[in-house]
């Protein structure tokens, strides 16, 4: 393999018009790659630290020049001449250089940009696609796309509390077919919204953001759209939710649909939804620190539905290990910028899979054209990917990359489909 010759960084814009970090890596053999870092809107309290400048006179305080300087002035010199193939050594070097528990000195956005760019460079130098370089010869499973077609919560300015309402084409035979089903249902949903006089404006992740009377009304719209597109709900296309409950939790209570309620109330509410709709996955149904609530929620619904920990686990192996020991949730959402390096991300995925937890690769609401997570989903055989609606180029870029990977794999490609959701019975 080739040693790292130079590392550069710059400030670019994400899909919400906020600055983010882009890193470029040059190897001694001439290989040149770049990676861009995403940013979230609903962020977990235990995520690795995203370093921003705090200068109110520039980008409203959201500039990332400090993180860029950290890459150029500190990280680059520290990893120069290291072998790009030594990902674990490079990531460990950056973590030690930062010296904090949450990567707050140099910024997780600085570390991640370098970590991903190095992995891409190593793959290119080895003349391998990234998914093959990271996953080896057995990486061949295409994930089920979890298409976020109705946006609420912190992703849209509406009365809908739940952040994401998703379509999951579990009955398709290939990824490309599943994506087509999702796209056709997305367009059917747009037509329905127009007929009903509802907004077809888009939220951060490309989904529609209509102002509805209730969260259940959004599920009803999805059921109607699936039927209008010519598909069978449950058998061909299932439903999923990202509740993002930490966004409406305060002082020991949840403000949900205009009422102050507790975890037991929400558990009963979602149990009713699971019984009423082909709902197969629920993400962050409770606050990230409501462990007792998760104990009850998992006991009640863990055998019936996928319970995904996002803010709960924040892609952190230590948080995940605590959850596994306690037996809460049964799936982890994997966001590379929550932990800040590729190797720590891979460690979290490995721990989850060894412990019988499913894994979901995920974008952030503030995205770029970077497609790393598409390759990563195939590399780790995640079986599921969340990267928004089939709209807005920063979302579609990931789906298009998965289409390329499917074609590259040829006859070896397998679509995860229903097998990605072992608890789902239809």
From Swiss-Prot:
Classification via InterPro entries: Enolase, Enolase-like_C_sf, Enolase-like_N, Enolase_C, Enolase_CS, Enolase_N
List of catalytic residues: 205 (proton donor), 335 (proton acceptor)
A GO cellular component entry from the record: phosphopyruvate hydratase complex
Binding site for (2R)-2-phosphoglycerate: 163, 335, 364-365, 386
NCBIfam families: eno
Gene Ontology molecular function: magnesium ion binding; phosphopyruvate hydratase activity
Residue intervals passing through the bilayer: none
Function: Catalyzes the reversible conversion of 2-phosphoglycerate (2-PG) into phosphoenolpyruvate (PEP). It is essential for the degradation of carbohydrates via glycolysis.
Pathway of action: Carbohydrate degradation; glycolysis; pyruvate from D-glyceraldehyde 3-phosphate: step 4/5
Keywords: Cytoplasm, Glycolysis, Lyase, Magnesium, Metal-binding, Secreted
Catalytic activity field: (2R)-2-phosphoglycerate = phosphoenolpyruvate + H2O
Family: Belongs to the enolase family.
Cofactor mode of binding and number, as noted: Binds a second Mg(2+) ion via substrate during catalysis.
Pfam families per UniProt: Enolase_C (PF00113), Enolase_N (PF03952)
CDD domains assigned to the protein according to its UniProt record, in alphabetical order: enolase (cd03313)
Cofactor(s) annotated in UniProt: Mg(2+)
Residues reported to bind Mg(2+): 242, 283, 310
Biological processes per GO annotation: glycolytic process
Name of the protein this chain belongs to: Enolase
Main location: cytoplasm
PROSITE patterns for the chain: ENOLASE
Subcellular location: Cytoplasm; Secreted; Cell surface
Assigned EC number: 4.2.1.11
Disulfide cysteine pairs (residue numbers): none
The gene coding this protein: eno
